[in-house]
Amino acid sequence: MEKADIESIPIKKTFDLKDEKDAYDAAEEMVRIGFYKEKKGFKILMPKESKKTAKRIGYIVTTTVTSSLRKEKQERDIKYWTYHHDKEHYGIVLVSSKVVEELGF
């Protein structure tokens, strides 16, 4: 999927994360808000200044979302894409695979 396609996905909330603790909090909030109530996804912005930190944030977000959905007995069929958002940020967009299909991506 191209960056333009990724950025055309409707976003419910954008999280600008600075560190690992922010990643855990954002993942828990995404699960609380829910992936299936609206035809929208979530966007995570991570700093490019430290590639190692960005990788850890991305890993924490994706694994915490999956494990939290399992704990809440919700469907875990989530798609995500990582991309270069801008000069200062990497981005991840997370969205339900059903929403991706309904939106025609």
Role assignments for model-derived ranges:
Residues 1-55, 98, 103-105:
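Positively charged, hydrophobic/aromatic-enriched amphipathic segments
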Residues 36-99, 103:
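Acidic, low-complexity, intrinsically disordered interaction modules
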